[in-house]
Amino acid sequence: MALSVPPIAGAIIGYFTNDLAITMLFRPYKPIKIGQRTLPFTPGLIPANQERLARRISDAIMGSLLTPEELQKLTRRLLQTERVQAAIQWLLKMALDQVQSETEQKSAQVLAHILHDLLGSAIPRLIRVWARREDFLEAQLNQIFDQVLLELKLSEEQAGRIADWLLQVVLPPDRLRQTLIDFLTDRNIQVIDEDLREKTSGTYWVVANLFGVRNTLIRLRDFCIEEREACNVRLAELMDALGVRQRLIEGLQDLSLQNLPVATVRQLRKVFRQNVRIYIQSQGLELVKGLSDSLNWEHVSLSILNRLRSSTAVTASLEVVSQELALVLERYLERDLEIIVEKAIPILNLDEVIVERVKATTPQELEAAIQGIVKSELQAIVTLGGVLGLLIGIAQSVLLLVQGGL
């Protein structure tokens, strides 16, 4: 019986030594005082030196685990192109959803202010500067001239409306009658009569010299003056008989810049560009400002936002934009990652974060954590302690047995 005590005692002591040692490191958690004196070894070793322990843990982690090189590796793994692209795409979608949410009115107001400032202030100043250049909008204005003005031709309906306007407003019968009266003055009649007598030949000379046109023109003038209504009717019938309206329609339809000589067209194109440039230089600023002030920018902004909401192109472009931004960020990190990490470490202040976290952890929590690690990961050491205690106890029993035999 006496020989069995040392192995059993050794096994028990060896098995529970680790738990006892850990407990002694932490217990008691608070200092024990008798009167004004504090008992030695209170509180436990770790609670009494928790701040120094926290600093040592921080130095160990920052010195061997979270080195700048390791942080660079972590950053590279964290900022892989696929992850960055996914994050950027998520942010863009969130921004688009934010625009489409209940803050749409606020977004529209912000966009309205931006557009109003852009069109009402920034763009006019830029246009005024650009308009001083000789080649300002040269290609665009040439394209407008060649594809719009040069190709411009009236349709039959348009030509008919213009012809009706000319015959009813510009040249009605009454105005033609008045024009004839104003034209057939005594002097003009005399000049016409003399020219016909002098410059005609053949049958026309005989008629001009025997009968003359003076009396005929005077009678025509008197008829226009005295018989106003009848003259207007006769002129209308004459114009209808001569097919003036149809001739005007045909003439208007044939009217085109393409029928002009090439040199004339080129000169017209040049004049068109110059006039547009001069107009923009002199009145372009006021024109754009007036246009900007006349627009309801908030309504325009709402229309733009609604268009973005329903636009499949915007949604489809998010992936492309996020991919391009991710590639740009990747190239930037490849070049300056080391510098960024060096600047980020003092900003992050990781060592102080570790110290504060360790200091904020109570001794009870630290003890429970270490006990958990020992039981789950270091159980073999506990078992080994029991085995060693058992072996030492057996050795003592053997030694006692030998001594007793002697």
Swiss-Prot record:
Keywords: Cell inner membrane, Cell membrane, Membrane, Transmembrane, Transmembrane helix
Alphabetical list of Pfam families matching this protein: DUF445
Cellular component GO terms, alphabetical: plasma membrane
Location relative to the cell: Cell inner membrane
Membrane-spanning residues: 381-401
UniProt membrane topology term: Single-pass membrane protein
Family annotation (InterPro entries): DUF445, UCP032178
Family, as annotated: Belongs to the UPF0754 family.
Entry protein name: UPF0754 membrane protein Cyan7425_4067
